[in-house]
Structures are given as structure tokens and as C-alpha cells.
């Protein structure tokens, strides 16, 4: 989440060390200036960094140092999140809002194909827990349908679970989700 880390990744790769690098969504969207609000929704681990670090992370995405964008989905119970900043448990949920939150900014900096790679194929391929998904006529569909030019306001109803600790709550996102296909079945947040 800080610029110096990308320098370490680049140096390791120059030495032939097989290292991967991901950056989470919220460190690309926010910098530490929002911490002045003392809003516990911004209490994240690792913590939000300076604007210069955020821009360095974006540069790392553009030059290929960053291999994937992660969601860093960390649910926190309401009673642990809706307290004073210093008493709150760090974390934020993001699965339901990651794509519409980041798509416009990401595709203004990289191609659509690179954005899809960073948000889907690369995280699946790099994760030890997930297979790298393929698309084919005989395979079950795992797709997310995005309306890239249709804004939406994030509300607690957008989250599938009972937890809605997100710095995006109440914010207008530049894109919105239509729904998804999971194992070939159509899903919306209402029936996920």
C-alpha cells in the first residue's frame, strides 16, 4: 500500500525472484486525507497512505508492477464498526461494490482488457484457493454484468450479508452492477 513496496517488488524481480504484487481497491480510491473525518469506515489494515503513495500504486498498475487488484473484503460487525475511530475494528466490505467503484478510474488508466485481467483472471490465477477460471461453451458461467455508464448510490441494501461497513456507503459510484452468473445461474443481490 505504500510506494516503497513497489520499488522492492521491482528490485526483487530484477534479481529473478518470483514475486507477485496486488493492491487493494480502497488504497486506490482513497488516501489518508479522509482520515481527518475520523470515520471508522476508513479504518483499514494496512492503513490508508498519503496521496503520493496512492498515485505510485496507480503508476505500478500502469507499468505492470502490480499483478492484481484485490478486494480486501473484511466484514466487521456493526457494533465493532460504528464506534469512535480509535475504538473500531479495522476492515471494510467490498465484494458487492468493488467493480462499479473502481471500473471508471481503472479504465481511464489502462485498457479494458488489462482492467479485466487485474480484477478477475489475475486474482484467480494468483490465489492458491481459486482455480484460474476459463470461459468456454461447455463450462459453467461465472460472469459479472456491469453497467459502466450507469451510476448508483451505495446503500446498506446493496450488501448481501448483515454487515455493511464500507467507506463507499452513501457515495455515488460511476458504474453499477446489473447482476452476475455464478455456476451458470443468474444472481442479483436480492437472490445471491
What is each stretch, according to the model?
Residues 1-69:
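Histidine/acidic residue-rich metal-binding segments in metalloenzymes
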Residues 41, 68-69, 74-148:
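His/Asp/Glu-enriched, well-ordered alpha-helical/loop segment
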Residues 6, 29, 77-79, 153-154, ...:
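Glycine/Thr-rich phosphate-binding loops of Rossmann-like dinucleotide-binding domains
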Residues 23, 39, 43, 80, ...:
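Residue-level signal for pocket-adjacent positions within structured domains
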Residues 42-53, 89-93, 166-173:
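A short acidic, glycine-rich active-site loop
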Residues 10, 81-82, 157-158:
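Short amphipathic alpha-helical segments
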Residues 140-191:
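C-terminal cap of metal-dependent C-N hydrolases
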Amino acid at each position: 500500500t505504500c510506494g516503497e513496496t513497489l520499488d522492492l517488488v521491482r528490485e526483487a524481480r530484477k534479481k529473478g525472484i518470483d514475486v507477485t504484487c496486488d493492491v487493494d481497491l480502497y488504497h486506490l480510491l482513497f488516501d489518508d486525507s479522509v482520515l481527518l473525518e475520523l470515520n471508522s469506515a476508513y479504518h483499514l489494515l494496512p492503513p490508508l497512505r498519503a496521496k503520493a503513495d496512492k498515485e505510485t500504486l496507480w503508476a505500478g498498475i500502469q507499468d505492470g508492477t502490480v499483478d492484481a487488484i484485490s478486494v480486501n473484503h473484511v466484514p466487521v460487525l456493526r457494533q465493532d464498526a460504528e464506534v469512535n475511530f480509535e475504538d473500531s475494528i479495522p476492515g471494510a466490505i467490498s465484494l458487492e461494490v468493488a467493480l462499479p467503484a473502481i471500473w471508471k478510474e481503472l479504465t481511464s488508466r489502462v485498457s479494458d482488457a488489462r482492467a479485466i485481467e487485474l480484477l478477475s483472471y489475475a486474482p484467480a490465477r494468483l490465489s492458491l484457493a481459486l482455480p484460474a477460471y476459463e470461459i468456454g461453451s461447455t463450462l459453467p458461467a461465472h460472469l459479472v454484468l456491469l453497467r459502466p455508464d450507469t451510476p448508483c448510490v451505495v446503500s446498506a441494501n446493496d450488501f448481501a450479508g448483515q454487515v455493511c461497513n464500507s467507506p463507499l456507503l452513501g457515495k455515488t459510484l460511476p458504474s453499477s452492477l446489473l447482476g452476475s452468473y455464478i455456476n451458470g445461474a443468474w444472481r442479483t443481490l436480492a437472490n445471491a
